[in-house]
Amino acid sequence: MAAFFQSAVKNTIIFSTALFSAFTFAQGKLAIVIDDIGYHPKEDGEVLAMPKEVSVAIIPAAPYAKIRNQEAKTQNHDILIHMPMQPVSNIKIEEGGLTLGLSEAQVNDRVKKAKAIVPNAIGMNNHMGSAATADTTLMTYLMTILREQNLFFLDSRTIGKSVAGKIAKEQGVRVLDRHVFLDDSDNLADVQRQFQSAIQYARKHGTAIAIGHPRPNTVAVLKAGIKNLPDDIQLVGMGSLWRNEKILPPKPFILIFNDIPAPTSVAPFEPIPLLRGVPR
């Protein structure tokens, strides 16, 4: 009888320990994408010196786009085409961007030219694009050519009524959404706060995708934050998320959080001065 109880207790402890360990060491995934690569050599270099899991989004029209593509590939970063797209405002976008009213042939041509400049890209995200990503016709043309080019799509969510994700799924293109903007404000404390928001979002939802820019405060926060990343958070590249069959993040194991999104931009997402136009 004593042996029976000892065995039962031992098995219970082993089971409980395994369950606790599985919960304790489950890691949230944090993906970081740095937009606007290709304009500033110094800042771009600091981004490329970060761990390879930090993904880079290169603007095809940027003067150093081809060079950055090769450097990022050499250093094993996941690369995105940061495609200029028409905003709701009248801000001029870079040459070769996507605007309302383009024909399907024109969209195809511009995407192919962008891919030729950034040939190692595995996906695309939008630079501005609050008008473009809300336009069903334009997004249908875009997702069709992205499927043909075997490119994924990351919706930067510059407007709440974006149809990019819906149409991408209809067209068979793997798509994910941005969750947190790291540097809507370039203030150091604000960037630090947004980085912590991304960590909390990853803990709650299992996955967080944060977008930032090659600015001094953003670089400083990321260097320190990545170096001291909590044990329960795993830094991952965008490719690993896109290729994962389970694109939608799993529900939290225990619902102890408020159902309030991480503090990022709020609809309509447009009044973000530091995200407008050609990067400074």
Model regions and ranges:
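Bacterial N-terminal signal peptides that target proteins for export
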Residues: A2-I13
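N-terminal signal peptide c-region/cleavage motif recognized by signal peptidases
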Residues: S21-F23
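Active-site beta->alpha N-cap acidic-glycine motif
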Residues: A26-I91
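Active-site mouth loops of central-metabolism enzymes
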Residues: L30-I34, E95-A105, D184-A189
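Hydrophobic faces of well-ordered beta-strands that scaffold small-molecule active sites
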Residues: L30-I34, V54-V56, I79-M83, M124-N126, ...
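Substrate-binding cleft of extracellular glycoside hydrolase catalytic domains
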Residues: A72-N120
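Catalytic domains of cell-wall/extracellular-matrix polysaccharide-remodeling enzymes
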Residues: E104-Q196, Y201-R203, H213-Q234
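C-terminal domain-boundary segment and adjacent tail
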Residues: E148-T158, N217-R280
